[in-house]
């Protein structure tokens, strides 16, 4: 099963899309010099206005990893996209020579804006999320585990998409899922398995698949977390409970960006926030066979686990 998360390698051919320079993402009003493949902002107010501009960014010399904090700014460098500086609600983009629009928009939406929100006190987890009835469900797992594919399966089953690629958790009250934007990053095998190819747009290895008709625009309580794993011997999907220790380890392991946590020296805060999620949400392990034709059954397994 293919997982449609942000990859640091460029796609084989440029993805064509009509980008907008004023959009809403993560409940933020985003004004961007880099066109983003989202619906244009149509009025109303976002929680905060974020401005993305192109300019010169010098990653701090001597810094380890792909994130650094210096003089109140947060720096990111992302292969095949560029170097980014976050100053409060301002983002400066220094695109690399090899950056294609697909890679740059994927980096901004999947890595940079979540890092900005992390710097403002939100928890960021790598994964996808959906609303099933009134329940908010997070799907976490390693790269290629099939998180986006399952999110697409849940969308196809009539459930609302909350986030893909990066899960942002707010702690005003109990943990809640912050809606990201009405797009899923899907590859052709998943689209074909769910008969969604006609709605995907121009062909390439991956698409920003529109889910405007099935997007949840308001925060949803984070009630369940599924740790998705492939089981080569499994004939059908299954769910298993996990210990509190295993739940905590899974949440820590799938942090949105370990480099950002380390660069900002917020390990203790990150640990406390993961502990709050582990305590508040029902965490289970979800096993899936390596068979895209079972996506509908995988979605039903999630539904049944919530009953």
What are the residue ranges of the model-derived segments?
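Residue-level signal for well-ordered alpha-helical segments
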Residues: 7, 61-63, 68-70, 89, ...
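Post-Walker A alpha-helix
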Residues: 150-151
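Long, basic/Gly/Ser/Thr-rich N-terminal segments
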Residues: 1-100, 300-307
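Aromatic pocket-lining residues of Rossmann-like dinucleotide-binding sites
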Residues: 154
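Conserved glycine(s) of the Walker
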Residues: 146-147
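Glycine-rich, often acidic-flanked micro-motifs
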Residues: 2-33, 39, 128, 132-142, ...
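Extreme N-terminal, non-catalytic leader segments
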Residues: 77-135
């Amino acid at each position: 099963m293919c997982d449609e998360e942000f990859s640091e390698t460029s796609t084989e051919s440029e993805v064509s899309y009509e980008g907008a320079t004023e959009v809403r993402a993560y409940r933020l009003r985003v004004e961007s010099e880099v066109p983003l493949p989202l619906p244009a902002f149509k009025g109303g107010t976002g929680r905060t206005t974020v401005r993305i501009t192109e300019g010169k960014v010098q990653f701090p010399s001597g810094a380890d990893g792909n994130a650094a904090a210096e003089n109140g700014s947060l720096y990111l460098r992302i292969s095949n996209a560029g170097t980014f500086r976050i100053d409060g609600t301002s983002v400066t983009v220094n695109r690399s020579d090899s950056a294609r629009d697909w890679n740059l928009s994927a980096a901004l939406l999947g890595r940079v804006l979540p890092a900005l929100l992390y710097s403002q006190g939100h928890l960021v987890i790598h994964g996808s999320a959906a609303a099933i009835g009134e329940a908010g469900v997070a799907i976490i797992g390693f790269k290629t585990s099939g998180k986006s594919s399952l999110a697409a399966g849940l969308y196809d089953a009539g459930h609302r998409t909350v986030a893909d690629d990066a899960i942002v958790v707010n702690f005003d009250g109990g943990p809640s899922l912050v809606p990201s934007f009405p797009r899923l990053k899907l590859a052709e095998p998943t689209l074909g398995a769910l008969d969604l190819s006609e709605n995907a747009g121009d062909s390439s290895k991956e698409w920003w698949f529109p889910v405007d008709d099935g997007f949840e625009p308001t925060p949803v309580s984070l009630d369940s977390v599924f740790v998705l794993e492939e089981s080569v011997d499994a004939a059908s999907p299954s769910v298993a409970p996990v210990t509190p220790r295993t739940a905590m380890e899974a949440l820590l392991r799938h942090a949105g960006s370990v480099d950002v946590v380390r660069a900002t020296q917020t390990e203790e805060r990150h640990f406390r926030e993961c502990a709050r999620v582990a305590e508040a949400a029902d965490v289970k392990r979800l096993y899936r066979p390596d068979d895209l034709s079972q996506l509908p059954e995988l979605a039903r397994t999630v539904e049944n686990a919530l009953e």
